[in-house]
Amino acid sequence: MEAVIEKECSALGGLFQTIISDMKGSYPVWEDFINKAGKLQSQLRTTVVAAAAFLDAFQKVADMATNTRGGTREIGSALTRMCMRHRSIEAKLRQFSSALIDCLINPLQEQMEEWKKVANQLDKDHAKEYKKARQEIKKKSSDTLKLQKKAKKGRGDIQPQLDSALQDVNDKYLLLEETEKQAVRKALIEERGRFCTFISMLRPVIEEEISMLGEITHLQTISEDLKSLTMDPHKLPSSSEQVILDLKGSDYSWSYQTPPSSPSTTMSRKSSVCSSLNSVNSSDSRSSGSHSHSPSSHYRYRSSNLAQQAPVRLSSVSSHDSGFISQDAFQSKSPSPMPPEAPNQLSNGFSHYSLSSESHVGPTGAGLFPHCLPASRLLPRVTSVHLPDYAHYYTIGPGMFPSSQIPSWKDWAKPGPYDQPLVNTLQRRKEKREPDPNGGGPTTASGPPAAAEEAQRPRSMTVSAATRPGEEMEACEELALALSRGLQLDTQRSSRDSLQCSSGYSTQTTTPCCSEDTIPSQVSDYDYFSVSGDQEADQQEFDKSSTIPRNSDISQSYRRMFQAKRPASTAGLPTTLGPAMVTPGVATIRRTPSTKPSVRRGTIGAGPIPIKTPVIPVKTPTVPDLPGVLPAPPDGPEERGEHSPESPSVGEGPQGVTSMPSSMWSGQASVNPPLPGPKPSIPEEHRQAIPESEAEDQEREPPSATVSPGQIPESDPADLSPRDTPQGEDMLNAIRRGVKLKKTTTNDRSAPRFS
């Protein structure tokens, strides 16, 4: 009996020791698992980041499929849904990674320390209990042996004690066996508890993974949709066919986008605000195939079909051939606030009706006057735009005449359908003109109806001059034709030069938005340079400019003269009374960038001062004094021969048109000469109009250079009457003589500083 119990206890003890040994030997396995789980979690975090970046790119592809014409909205929608499902999978993957570190790895590391303590404690408790039970059994067994020895000696009263001792020994063995069994149970429970704990830690991780993988099942439906949408790549779906059908009959047109002609709207210059007010009308009213250089238009080179629509365009437009904005007090607002007298000015001498092919010239009395233009009198070209029916008010000085001929929407990279070279269409006028009975009568400012009915003049006019001998006149005309040809061809030379010279601003700088004073940072270096002579201060409201294309032959004669000292700009140079003619598109002199620093503009009083653009003095035509007006050339076909094909016919009114001296710079110039002194009527034989090059030469020659030898060269140009100028002076010598520079004082910071 005892041997059987002893054997059983020994087996239980061995089992316990095996269990404890297994638990202690499992620690490296748990540690390796924790290590590998940490690496997996790290890779999952990297995968989450990569998946997020991948899905961002995937979403862009889906958006592109939605917005492009080739990809339909159905494909884009399916791809978007696919991306959304993947984003949900990515979110579940992120949660799975978090659960792996929070619910499994970290708790398992903490639990392992507890497991080690419990296993050691179980082993110690088992050893203690086993030792105690063995000691008790040994003691009882020793007592039983003593009683057995006494019973063998023949003592009969010892037998009951012996039986009791044997029972105690048996009980101790049974207790030992039970103790061993309890120890084994505890060891097994502990070992099982470890796995149960591990499963409890792994369950949330598995749940997150199942949730993540559950999202994948939604991809099957989306994949089937994409397969059906892209079944036949070579067949257009109905939605794409509808795009083609919707395009029919619409006015949608486009042109290749080229580099911008102006700075951005945040740093745009003088024409930004004015052009932003009419950018919608101007973009819709351009002729087909042409481009707009409006700086505030979002699509700068957008064209529309004029044949389908002819909307009303604002009279204040961005002048393309001068680069300045015609300022209209009623229609547009200047980028910089002007003084109260600023509405009575033209910023460049460019007519508000620059899109029309004719100019309505009011009576040339003393002072400025508003002039109403009835819409019924307009005779636009095929490509011109009808003006509004209401009257536009602008002021035109006596002696100013708008002569710009190039439409502002013209694409300067190539000539338009109506922009033939002027030299091919000029006709020489050698016939004498008949006397004009209206030439001697003074015209006052009280006759706007007469101006509305009679003053139908084309933009390109010639300046009336004294009669010259036929041979000299022919030679001058030859020179004029050569010069005008150089100007005309130079205008169409390249889009770069025309953009630089015509748009009025070349690069984005930090100069005030109203100024034109900049040395371009691009290749072409167009600068604005004043060559004004003596001037008076009672004509400050005229805003004038004078530019010459850099590559023209005219500018070469002034190049050496201006090499020494030149300002970077004369955008703020004040203009005063003097025989000046302003030609916005054609007077910039080409040169290398000046070393003189440009002075920035300051403010005086409450608002900024008006911008005074450069002017060039011009020799007053040599005609006798006239009491109040300039002579008017008669109507006739010979006047028509001086214009380009765009010019309408002259002589619309029943009476002679009051003329103003102006120069036609190959259809690009507008003239703002000041009011001349009273002049008497001149005979008809003296009303032989000189060609445009003579007016150009007169514009280049300061009055001080054209006085007779008996006059003092330093005399004020205003004091020189037209009769003081010699009539027979050679125009070629006048060109060679060049331009005299005169120092002027101004408080405008953008004005040049002459040392």
From Swiss-Prot:
Oligomer status and interactors: Binds to actin. Binds to the cytoplasmic domain of receptor protein tyrosine phosphatase delta.
Protein name: Protein MTSS 1
Coiled-coil ranges from the UniProt annotation: 108-155
Keyword Nucleotide-binding among record annotations: no
Bias-annotated ranges (Polar residues): 656-671
A molecular function (GO) term: actin monomer binding
Modified residues (Phosphoserine): 261-262, 271, 322, 644, 647
Entry comment, domain topic: The WH2 motif at the C-terminus binds to actin monomers.
Domain of life: Eukaryota
Transmembrane found in the keyword field: no
Ranges for region Disordered: 139-159, 255-305, 327-351, 428-470, 490-513, 563-755
Lineage of origin: Eukaryota, Metazoa, Chordata, Craniata, Vertebrata
Keywords from the named record: Actin-binding, Coiled coil, Cytoplasm, Cytoskeleton, Phosphoprotein, Tumor suppressor
Tissue: Expressed in many tissues, including spleen, thymus, prostate, testis, uterus, colon, and peripheral blood.
Assigned protein family: Belongs to the MTSS family.
Gene: MTSS1
Segments forming domain WH2: 727-744
Localization per Swiss-Prot or TrEMBL: Cytoplasm, Cytoskeleton
Gene Ontology biological process terms from the UniProt entry: actin cytoskeleton organization; adherens junction maintenance; cell adhesion; cell surface receptor protein tyrosine kinase signaling pathway; cellular response to fluid shear stress; epithelial cell proliferation involved in renal tubule morphogenesis; glomerulus morphogenesis; microspike assembly
Biased composition (Low complexity): 443-453, 608-623
PROSITE patterns: IMD (PS51338), WH2 (PS51082)
Function: May be related to cancer progression or tumor metastasis in a variety of organ sites, most likely through an interaction with the actin cytoskeleton.
Residues bearing PTM Phosphothreonine: 258, 425, 603
Listed InterPro entries: AH/BAR_dom_sf, I-BAR_dom, MTSS1/MTSS2, WH2_dom
PANTHER family: ACTIN BUNDLING/MISSING IN METASTASIS-RELATED, PROTEIN MTSS 1
Domain IMD: 1-250
A single cellular component GO annotation: actin cytoskeleton
